[in-house]
């Protein structure tokens, strides 16, 4: 997983390799990346960082050549995998969302799989089993950032028609999760505020990643920059 490997991949694509091709077994260009990300769980930390950097750079290259990380089936979707493990793969997920990847199935929409549903499902699952305050705070902060990234990528959030949560299953932080959920539902059913539409438009124009770095460089008042930014303390770039 050296720079030479990435150079070779870039050279192959420049010679016409099809990033949308699949093998006879149904493997896609993201199959190996998903496998490698799985190898980072519970392994050596330094090796995990090296794998994550490699997966990030290759994903960046593939998306630049038109690869879609949000196609179904879900187990072959890099976006779906990152959403399910949003705490672990947060930097890569942020890159995907800021680079135009759909937070729902890009072929069939939210009725197939939905980023909002996955995040709330994983949030409730993790917070039902952990009383660790620092873990809960970090998980909630990352979940809020992911939800905000998804909201800021479309004028109206695309939710499944039957989208709901069972807050009673969340033993800890249930009220905070309900507040997040209801604010999202309200955004879906209310007329969109002009400032939200402007935020979506500006962030779309600044894609791809890193959008927040580009916002900070704009000749705008600090108050406006603050509204445009997501996760004010971190652009995500330093985590790669």
PLM feature segments, named:
Residues 19, 26, 36-43, 69, ...:
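Alpha-solenoid repeat scaffolds
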Residues 49, 81-240:
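Cullin-RING E3 adaptor/co-adaptor recruitment helices
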């Amino acid at each position: 997983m050296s720079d030479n490997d990435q150079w070779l991949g870039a050279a192959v694509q420049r010679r016409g390799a099809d990033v949308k091709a699949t093998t006879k077994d149904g493997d896609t260009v993201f199959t190996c990346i998903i496998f490698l990300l799985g190898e980072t769980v519970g392994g050596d930390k330094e090796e995990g960082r090296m794998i994550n950097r490699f997966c990030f750079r290759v994903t960046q290259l593939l998306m630049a050549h038109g690869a879609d990380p949000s196609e179904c089936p879900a187990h072959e979707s890099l976006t779906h995998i990152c959403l399910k493990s949003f705490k672990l793969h947060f930097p890569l997920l942020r890159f995907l969302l800021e680079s135009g990847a759909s937070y729902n199935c890009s072929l069939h929409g939210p009725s197939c799989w939905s980023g909002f549903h996955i995040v709330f499902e994983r949030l409730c699952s993790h917070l039902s089993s952990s009383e660790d305050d620092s873990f809960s705070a970090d998980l909630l902060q990352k979940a809020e950032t992911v939800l905000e990234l998804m909201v800021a990528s479309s004028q109206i959030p695309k939710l499944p028609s039957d989208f709901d949560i069972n807050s009673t299953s969340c033993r800890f932080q249930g009220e905070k999760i309900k507040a997040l959920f209801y604010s999202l539902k309200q955004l879906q059913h209310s007329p969109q505020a002009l400032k939200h539409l402007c935020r979506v438009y500006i962030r779309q124009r600044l894609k791809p990643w890193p959008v927040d770095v580009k916002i900070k460089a704009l000749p705008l008042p600090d108050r406006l920059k603050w509204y445009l930014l997501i996760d004010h303390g971190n652009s995500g770039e330093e985590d790669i």
